[in-house]
């Protein structure tokens, strides 16, 4: 039977896979996120029976219309990327949603939480448990699935482990590597989530979600290393706390630092799971850890075969399995009174004889460095000096996405350990416009991360200068510039 389903937090990892599954099963889906552009870049904009809705639960907006015709809700919101105060942010979002949920005609809420340990003091785990309690206070039927590590491409916990294995031949780790948990394959989790719709009930329930094996993090990383032909040594150190380990995370993994830090702080506890109750309720064949990892590695190129990269064949052919799934980024945003049209007119002049608006000497130096290792960055080229089209080559760059007066994305063409792109984004905010210049980088192993951090000071210096110079060329005013790095 077709249902109207609201997916709250569709821009997250599980939501990005759950929404297509629900559509394939014939349901009408409302997918919400704080960044609709991210949802659109997945190619969701024109899908039948899918409605994309901007939703920021922290702004205390009225949710009556959102919940009006909804039968089932999937609540997938978490605040790990919010920063040090994410627990307060997460619980406040849950309270706000629960307030309107209580007054709605929603039949059932399926909430994806986290496995719990009796002695756990992790803020991440506490927040997940308390969110479930808040949702139950609405009086609605709440089905809470408590999951541990999800094995799939883009799963933050899985990607942290994969980056550790790919980047470090020897790992000096906190003693949490001996903690045990029950990792589950993404495919198994999605089956549980979607089959729950077929089990109508008026009784709230809590289920542990567990794969077929109880493994330590050390065992998982060693087995992952074997599957990618990477021999590693894991050496636990009692004096190395998770808090201390969290400080160097940004230099080892491309997973966003706030998320990785929150996860690491929860890894020090055993998270035993008894999945027998859920298996009896919704039987399925559970995939082994090794098979789940192999499946995740086969799906790894899904990040590149997307609208974010313009479905570009050159980007797809250059992607390698050991590239970081999550990109590093660095950019500079500037407010201005210049029009979108004037800014776009200048952005289209990038490259060729015109150069790059600012610090052209540094651009030339980088091009010479590329030439010295066999690259072709010294070959200056533009099809047209004034206008750009999709697929155009600009020196060593390639136009992979273009939206007039708003957006330009260039595929990085020089030799370096990773894959990247350079984006120009113009947004109209009514009283002012913003111009943002940003580099995105998927590092190849530890060398790729070293390259990124070595180049970051130059990136920030150049992007700041480029944005100001673009505004100056428009004979306009600029104010409130802002640096952003992840």
List the predicted regions and their residue ranges:
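Mid/C-terminal beta-alpha module of Rossmann-like enzyme folds, strongest
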Residues: 196-259, 270-332
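A conserved amphipathic terminal alpha-helix motif
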Residues: 290-294, 443, 448-486
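Glycine-rich portal/gate segments that line the openings of hydrophobic small-molecule binding cavities
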Residues: 335-344, 348-417, 469
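Glycine-/Pro-rich loop/turn segments that contact NAD(P) or position catalytic residues
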Residues: 79-167
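NAD(P)H-binding glycine-rich loop region in Rossmannoid oxidoreductase-like domains
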Residues: 37, 41-104, 114-120
């Amino acid at each position: 039977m077709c249902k109207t389903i609201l997916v709250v937090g569709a821009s997250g990892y599980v939501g990005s896979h759950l929404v297509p599954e629900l559509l394939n099963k014939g349901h009408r889906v409302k997918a919400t996120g704080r960044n609709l552009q991210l949802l659109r870049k997945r190619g969701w904009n024109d899908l039948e029976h899918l409605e994309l809705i901007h939703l920021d639960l922290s702004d205390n907006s009225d949710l009556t219309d959102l919940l009006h015709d909804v039968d089932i809700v999937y609540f997938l919101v978490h605040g790990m990327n919010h920063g040090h105060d994410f627990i307060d942010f997460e619980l406040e979002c849950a309270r706000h949603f629960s307030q309107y949920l209580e007054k709605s005609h929603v039949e059932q809420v399926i909430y994806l939480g986290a496995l719990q340990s009796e002695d756990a003091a992790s803020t991440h785990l506490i927040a997940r448990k308390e969110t479930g309690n808040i949702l139950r206070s609405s009086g609605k039927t709440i089905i809470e699935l408590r999951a541990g590590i999800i094995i799939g491409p883009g799963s933050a916990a899985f990607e942290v482990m994969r980056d550790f294995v790919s980047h470090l031949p020897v790992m000096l780790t906190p003693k949490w590597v001996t903690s045990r948990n029950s990792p589950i394959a993404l495919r198994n989790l999605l089956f549980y989530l979607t089959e729950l719709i077929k089990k109508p009930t008026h009784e709230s329930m809590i289920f542990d979600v567990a794969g077929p094996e109880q493994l330590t993090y050390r065992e998982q990383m060693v087995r992952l290393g074997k599957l990618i032909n990477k021999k590693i040594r894991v050496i636990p150190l009692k004096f190395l706390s998770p808090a201390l380990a969290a400080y160097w995370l940004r230099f080892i993994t491309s997973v966003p630092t706030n998320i990785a830090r929150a996860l690491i702080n929860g890894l020090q506890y055993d998270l035993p799971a008894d999945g027998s109750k859920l298996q009896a309720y919704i039987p399925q064949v559970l995939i082994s850890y090794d098979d789940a990892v192999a499946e995740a590695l086969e799906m790894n190129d899904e990040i590149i075969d997307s609208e974010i990269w313009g479905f570009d064949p050159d980007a797809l052919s250059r992607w390698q399995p050991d590239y970081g799934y999550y990109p590093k980024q660095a950019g500079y945003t500037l407010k201005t009174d210049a029009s979108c049209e004037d800014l776009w007119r200048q952005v289209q002049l990038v490259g060729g004889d015109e150069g790059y608006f600012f610090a052209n000497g540094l651009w030339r130096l980088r091009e010479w460095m590329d030439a010295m290792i066999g690259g072709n960055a010294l070959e200056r080229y533009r099809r047209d000096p004034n206008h750009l089209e999709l697929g155009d080559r600009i020196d060593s760059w390639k136009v992979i996405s273009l939206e007039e007066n708003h957006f330009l994305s260039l595929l990085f063409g020089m030799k370096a350990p990773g894959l990247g792109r350079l984006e120009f984004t113009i947004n109209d905010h009514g009283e002012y416009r913003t111009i943002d210049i940003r580099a995105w980088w998927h590092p190849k192993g530890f060398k790729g991360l070293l390259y990124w951090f070595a180049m970051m000071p130059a990136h920030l210096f150049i992007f700041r200068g480029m944005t100001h110079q673009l505004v100056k060329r428009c004979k306009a005013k600029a104010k409130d510039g802002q640096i952003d790095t992840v």
